[in-house]
């Protein structure tokens, strides 16, 4: 039962059916968890016409807050997801005129590497619109310390670090014989470091063929990236090792995790990649770069191998996890345990609620 003095929290996001999008995957999950908190009344103002499957909260598609039904036409707090959405500017102006606080969750879009993409266009947009949007936010909610540290080129009032959570599946990957490594995500070759992955494989191609090892890549095409990846795979003569697939979701996605021995993501920039967290929850060790924000954690917590963006280091890590079953199983057990102890949604949603309450009450430091 929601109380009359519950926080009225409106999330504003661009959610689609593209499950390779971290925002479209993770935001509906934590809104479902937040909807269970008795002292918080939440809704989603979606900037598309899509309604998230199994949503336990109201979903609106009207981009004018004052026309929303009670109580969301007068929210206690608004959460903006991502930065470069034009509707955010209009809505933030409306909020400021009414002294309604707002939080921005950039989802990695303020990092140095992310800002280098379409650099000139972003510089102009920042000067005219988004610097003020960020500066006037009551808090910037980062998903990791790495994201916060690499986003310090922007002035803001306050910052908070709360990671995403993950639903822990009942099943655990335990396939000792599959010899499959996995990547799931947008097929953005540069951002996701897929060029690094493919170019590292010729260094160990003979060993991988001897093991019968495969690299499965799943994800949607990104501006013709599927064809570019196919050419890159052919040029590096690893077409028999790398299997390139379209996007995967639901049970098919679960099966992809369950049939794999480890997960690999070599991103150059991320906020807090959902697929890495999902892999840990299934008990898959991870091979990750600094850009994923997981490199130090992988090494320090014994849940995978953190590597430099170096072809030899990447190939050595891949071969190690394919060859050493005992070591890989040790990492796998630690990976699932780490996800269970630190990233279950219920605990994450409680931390988010405390942040929201403190912002509304003017208590955030």
Show the residue positions of the predicted features.
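Aromatic "clamp/platform" in nucleotide-sugar-dependent glycosyltransferases that forms part
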Residues: 268
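Conserved donor-binding/catalytic core segment of Leloir-type glycosyltransferases
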Residues: 10-11, 141, 173-192, 198-201, ...
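Short hydrophobic beta-strand element within catalytic cores of glycosyltransferases
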Residues: 285-289
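Carbohydrate-associated surface elements
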Residues: 146, 165
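Glycosyltransferase donor-sugar binding loop
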Residues: 46-49, 184, 213-228, 246
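Conserved acidic donor-binding segment of nucleotide-sugar-dependent glycosyltransferases
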Residues: 300, 304-312, 320-326
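Short alpha-helical donor nucleotide-sugar binding micro-motif in glycosyltransferases
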Residues: 72, 134, 247-248, 255-260
